[in-house]
């Protein structure tokens, strides 16, 4: 087991103990993120699915459990939840996980968050919805926080990189 894995597992134990005495949306975010990290470094599909399921439960519960939660924290929880579902999609190739990602993030587009737009484009391209991919990428590229390197290197966007409109959409 690598040092990083040991550190993550140790921190999971610590945060799970904190959950018993002092739960908060921030703690749920950390607990979910730790499980997402384990899912991404695991080489076992069964382990990945287990950690993703745990992360999803923690993040979804935190989104609905608290009456008063700052919008920025709600967006972070939602983005982590969307990431978990898209990792699920990458493992299973089941389009329903991309659809769930869209359902989670669409209501948050009012915030004009680059990461929300990116994940919506990622979910759309995963479902082969090229018009919606173009729409969300257009919004993403208009935000100051867009990352061209990420867009160019992400394998999910390979099908649209060759599209006639793609180079025109990129900022000069």
Region roles according to the model:
Residues 9-18, 49-65, 93-108, 131-140, ...:
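Alpha-helical repeat scaffolds
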Residues 64, 68-73, 109-116, 143-153:
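Boundary/linker segments of alpha-helical solenoid repeat arrays
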Residues 72-86, 147-168:
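TPR/TPR-like alpha-solenoid helical repeat scaffolds
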Residues 1-25:
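N-terminal intrinsically disordered, low-complexity tails enriched in polar/charged
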Residues 111-144:
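Sterile Alpha Motif
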Residues 9, 21-43, 60, 68-90, ...:
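Amphipathic alpha-helical repeat scaffolds of TPR domains
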Residues 1-7, 36-54, 85-98, 128-131:
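Short coil/turn connectors between adjacent alpha-helices in alpha-solenoid helical repeat scaffolds
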């Amino acid at each position: 087991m690598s040092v990083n894995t040991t550190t993550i597992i140790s921190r999971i134990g610590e945060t799970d103990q904190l959950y018993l005495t002092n739960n908060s949306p921030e703690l749920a975010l950390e607990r979910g993120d730790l499980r997402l990290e384990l899912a991404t470094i695991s080489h076992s599909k069964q382990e990945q699915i287990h950690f993703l399921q745990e992360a999803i439960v923690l993040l979804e519960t935190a989104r609905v459990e608290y009456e008063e939660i700052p919008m920025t924290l709600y967006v972070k929880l939602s983005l982590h939840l969307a990431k978990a579902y898209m990792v699920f999609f990458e493992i299973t190739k089941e389009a329903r996980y991309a659809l769930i990602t869209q359902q989670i993030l669409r209501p948050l587009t009012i915030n004009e968050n680059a990461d929300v737009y990116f994940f919506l484009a990622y979910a759309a391209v995963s479902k082969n919805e090229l018009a919606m991919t173009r729409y969300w990428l257009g919004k993403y590229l208009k935000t100051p926080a867009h990352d061209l390197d990420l867009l160019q290197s992400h394998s999910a966007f390979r099908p649209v990189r060759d599209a006639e409109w793609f180079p025109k959409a990129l900022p000069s």
